[in-house]
Amino acid sequence: MATRFPKFSQGLSKDPTTRRIWYGIATAHDFESHDGITEEKLYQKIFASHFGQLAVIFLWTSGNLFHVAWQGNFEQWVQDPLHVRPIAHAIWDPHFGQPAVEAFTRGGASGPVNIAYSGVYQWWFTIGMRTNLDLYRGALFLLFLSTLALLAGWLHLQPKWKPSVSWFKNAESRLNHHLSGLFGVSSLAWSGHLVHVAIPEARGQHVRWDNFLTSIPHPQGLQPFFTGNWSIYAQDPDSMNHLFGTSEGAGTAILTFLGGFHPQTQSLWLTDIAHHHLAIAILFIVAGHMYRTNFGIGHSIKEILEAHTPPGGRLGRGHNGLYDTLNNSLHFQLGLALASLGVITSLVAQHMYSLPAYAFIAQDFTTQAALYTHHQYIAGFIMVGAFAHGAIFFIRDYNPEENKENVLARMLEHKEAIISHLSWASLFLGFHTLGLYVHNDVMQAFGTPEKQILIEPVFAQWIQATHGKTLYGFDVLLSSNQSPALNAGANLWLPGWLDAINNGNNSLFLTIGPGDFLVHHAIALGLHTTTLILVKGALDARGSKLMPDKKEFGYSFPCDGPGRGGTCDISAWDAFYLAVFWMLNTIGWVTFYWHWKHITLWQGNVSQFNESSTYLMGWLRDYLWLNSSQLINGYNPLGMNSLSVWAWMFLFGHLIWATGFMFLISWRGYWQELIETLAWAHERTPLANLIRWKDKPVALSIVQARLVGLSHFSVGYIFTYAAFLIASTSAKFG
């Protein structure tokens, strides 16, 4: 007899209802709960799945390169990056009528195409690619890597090649290899690529495999390196008149510390980027020799944690027991990794627009908006996941005996103080920010805008001034001519930095006023409330005053309202569920702010943002409503244009989003009755009754319905805003 899905759970596979399918999908990746799982099998499965993940990533990037080379216009774009619209791929759609075919035939293409707003053209151009052949070679190489990763994954599941648990728990070796090998050597390799291929290409010198070994990246070769005259590599940088991709105005420097942006491309100097990666490489390669492994030298993390006695005994037993707690809990490790990755992803969003690294990307406004929004949403989901796995750690892996009186136990002991402080901060931010906005709305409505409460963000302006922004007249540190900081570092403070920070043509330290002050605090409210929900969910996951320890209840123990008595207090799943809504709303405010401020900057009417962002009606009317007009006219009774696909996605996104509420605000018995009625009708309808099912239809559980509702809400919300963002920006700037 064939085993029914799911094979990993015999108990579940025998369930006669549709619950078998839903629970099977829900627990497919919860390896810990599978039949016959051992610690060794668990680690090996996760290890092998990492190779699968790499294979998918390589295949995806290979596909990007291949489709652009096959159906894109990379070679035409390279000739004129500012005026040719980059093509992602062709659209094959038999449903298109003639008006649609004409509307979507752009960028010099012969048929309907999709425009690329991902920035890949600018990236490939910056790193030295120039022809379709370059793209094809890249695609083929990545396809080879993808196959290699799949083979490695399969190999490490074979008996002879399965690593042991002790190998996975050798933290020092893993840290050394990841620091030196993963970060250090890869940064060194990237610096090498920039110096040997990308920088020469930016100066009109074509370096490929046939002349790679004969083209010296610097006229003096390695002599300055071996003689210690490293500064020679920084002499003669590209001039301010350098035309990117040509020898006109090009210098010979390969590792510089200029600061600021290349005047033509509006992106960071490639020689600065190469220098940065070389410095990172050295730092990480050194760091990767820090921990004790084979030779009995270096640090032992366990010894460090146990030797560190907190001053005055104020933190109990400090970090005692933490090494084993962390090293034996995959959820703890994953939580920390996700928290780090979430922060980094958000920083990537901030730096991609303020310090653009890719040539001409700063002038492609739709791409800038898309990349910022994309990275902020990704960061939000990753951060929420960090807390979810932190909560699972407390439920499944935390052992109070092993952590007596250490910092982890003490944090749990004063969780009430942590939660109440976060609660107070959220309440303070919420009432004051909303109060200011609403007051300003009322003043606008009554025709007395001069009575608005407008607060200048003086502390933030002062911080901008210390970094060199002179506009506010603070005359402090780098913005002061007499400052010892400025004089002492005349050649150190990246000569181009001070020009860039005071130049109105980039997004570096944007000028801020009362509208920024208010939205900053609205975002702070969102961040603090999301954090409050997540922190409370994790700290109370194992129990509260009402229910001391719920280890056996598991993570997806549902909160069922006051009728069940106190279960909402200790449901980490429900905290996660609630936090996702707050996270999405917070990132909504972040992206609204970024987008509106930049639209007005790019259009040269920044006063619109400054005047309208101080009250809520301004946001609704002058940002959302005003910018959705082009979108809603994607197709109308007079015909259609290239925005029609975004108009359709905008409507469809709203539909998915609204469907979520059907699952979120409903009574479970109603669904069961509805399903039974549909099943009854199906079985009695000719033709339809030829199709039978073996599983008895059962309504979703509370947790499942919340998950389905939440996923619809999230996907619909993001679809809707993505369509709005891309259509409103591309309609204005192309």
From Swiss-Prot:
Q: Which gene encodes it?
A: psaB
- At which positions is chlorophyll a B3 bound? 662, 670
What protein am I looking at? Photosystem I P700 chlorophyll a apoprotein A2
What is this enzyme's catalytic activity, as reactions? reduced [plastocyanin] + hnu + oxidized [2Fe-2S]-[ferredoxin] = oxidized [plastocyanin] + reduced [2Fe-2S]-[ferredoxin]
* Ranges that cross the membrane: 46-69, 135-158, 175-199, 273-291, 330-353, 369-395, 417-439, 517-535, 575-596, 643-665, 707-727
Offer a single GO CC term for the protein: chloroplast thylakoid membrane
Q: Where is the signal peptide?
A: none
Q: Which Gene3D superfamilies match?
A: Photosystem I PsaA/PsaB
What is the superkingdom listed in this entry's lineage? Eukaryota
- Per UniProt, the enzyme's principal EC class comes to oxidoreductase
Its keywords, alphabetically, are: 4Fe-4S, Chlorophyll, Chloroplast, Chromophore, Electron transport, Iron, Iron-sulfur, Magnesium, Membrane, Metal-binding, Oxidoreductase, Photosynthesis, Photosystem I, Plastid, Thylakoid, Transmembrane, Transmembrane helix, Transport
